[in-house]
């Protein structure tokens, strides 16, 4: 997973990531998450996205 962009939108952090299979995803998080929790969440999402079948 590569986090290639991080910014704030309406006060909430937004992360744009590229997964192992080169899928592009934008994730908007709640301010209550710590950096550690956000990276765990992004890792889980990356695995789910990489295993999804796209038609």
Swiss-Prot record:
InterPro entries: VraX (IPR035374). Pfam families: VraX (PF17412). This is Protein VraX. It comes from Staphylococcus aureus (strain Mu50 / ATCC 700699). The lineage of its organism: Bacteria, Bacillati, Bacillota, Bacilli, Bacillales.
């Amino acid at each position: 997973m590569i986090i290639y962009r991080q910014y704030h939108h309406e006060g909430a952090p937004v992360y744009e990531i590229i997964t192992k299979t080169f899928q592009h995803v934008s994730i908007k998080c709640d301010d209550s998450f710590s950096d550690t929790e956000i990276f765990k969440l992004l890792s889980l999402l990356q695995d789910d996205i990489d295993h999804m079948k796209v038609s």
